Amino acid sequence: MTLYMDVHNIDGGVALKDVAQAHMADLQTQDQYGVRYLRYWVDEANGKVFCLIDSPDADAANRVHREAHGLVAQEIYPVEEGD
């Protein structure tokens, strides 16, 4: 599996509580696709959400988002964890 960081750009800003609810929906859906949603970060004022995902591929990570709540990422990058 590969670590990915995805980026969501949400016009008009985003509330942390709404992202928390979406993350819970991801957790309920992730096993169907062999994906693990690990963490997320939110920039409420600028409408940015960043998710750290352990996934077989980028498409599987976005499929979870699509099925769980419909908010797919606009960008997704493979990343490596540093020491």
What do these predicted regions represent?
Residues 29, 51, 65:
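Functionally engaged cysteine thiol sites
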Residues 9, 52-54:
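Short hydrophobic/aromatic beta-strand micro-patches
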Residues 1-32, 36-38, 42-47, 81-83:
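Short S/T/G/P-rich N-terminal loop/turn motif that feeds into the first structured element of a domain
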